[in-house]
Regions:
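ABC ATPase nucleotide-binding domain signature region
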Residues: 5-7, 11-14, 53-58, 62-118
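Conserved N-terminal flank of the Walker A/P-loop in ABC nucleotide-binding domains
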Residues: 40, 47, 55-56
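ABC-family P-loop ATPase nucleotide-binding domains
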Residues: 38-40, 90, 95-156, 160-168, ...
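Conserved catalytic segment of ABC-fold P-loop ATPases
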Residues: 212-219
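Pre-NBD coupling/linker segments of ABC/ABC-like ATPases
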Residues: 2-42, 237-244
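Helical segment within the ABC ATPase nucleotide-binding domain
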Residues: 183-196
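H-loop/switch region of ABC-family ATPase nucleotide-binding domains
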Residues: 204-205
Length: 246
């Protein structure tokens, strides 16, 4: 059964930037004689969250409050500095559609690459099904993504990222990156993914969206949980949610 457990989790960033988690950077620093202690900033501060099947959790807060960073911790992109993280179930992190894509590769090869990164076997049937969803000309599969317009590129990346259901779905804002002629179809596909997932966590500035779609809202500020607002459903519709009243 899908489950997320975070207990007293902290994440410290090197002060010179989050990208410097790399081993290469550390080795170069040592060769340059910069082996002293690195100054850090605490991005996630002592956070505990428990979620089981049926949970729809919204992450709210101002820019820099830690919403996106917390999603990346849960997805395994960043290692926690301290605390305990336990994830049970298949995780789909929709945090950046272009992550892992190579614009110099042809479209079909990019689809296969992205599927492998997500742990899926890119069979011909699966690639063809993904391509059919994009509604793009069949011949474009053999063109490098660099030749695609931004709208066409997003169609390919969106169709690939959302091709399979997941136990745990992580969303950094509600996806609205596809062109206008494709948006309704993409919205329905995303809603289906959300309904199929056992646990959904979405970070957003849109309070109305969170209140409409979530069972609880976790309010963050400076990497800390300020409070958690519980909500409940009064409708058979999966998104017919409203706040509990005392």
């Amino acid at each position: 059964m899908a489950r997320i457990s975070l207990r007293d989790v902290c994440l410290d960033y090197p002060l010179y930037g989050a990208y410097d988690f790399s081993l290469k950077r550390r080795l170069l620093g040592r060769l340059a004689g910069q082996s002293g202690p690195t100054r850090t900033i605490r991005a996630i501060d002592n956070i505990s969250i428990e979620a089981c099947a049926g949970a729809r959790i919204g992450l709210a807060g101002p820019n820099g409050s830690g919403k996106s960073t917390l999603l990346r911790l849960i997805a395994g992109v960043y290692p926690a500095t301290s605390g305990h993280i336990e994830i049970t179930g298949n995780v789909m992190p929709l945090l950046g559609l272009n992550a892992g894509a190579n614009l110099d590769f042809v479209a079909a090869d990019n689809i296969s690459l992205l599927l492998r990164i997500s742990g899926r076997k890119p069979t011909r049937a699966i690639v063809d099904e993904i391509w059919a969803f994009t509604e793009l000309d069949e011949r474009m599969q053999r063109l490098p993504l660099r030749m695609f317009s931004s709208g066409m590129l997003m169609r390919v990346l969106f169709a690939t990222a959302t091709a399979f259901p997941a136990d745990i779905l992580l969303l950094d804002e509600w996806l609205s990156v596809v062109d206008e002629n494709f948006s309704a179809k993409a919205e329905q596909r995303l809603l289906k993914l959300v309904s199929q997932a056992a646990i959904v966590i979405i970070a957003s500035h849109d309070q109305e969206l969170l209140r409409r779609t979530c069972t609880s809202i976790v309010n963050l500020d400076r990497g800390r949980i300020i409070n958690t607002v519980s909500l409940e459903t009064h409708s058979a519709h999966p998104f017919g949610l409203r706040e509990k009243r005392a």
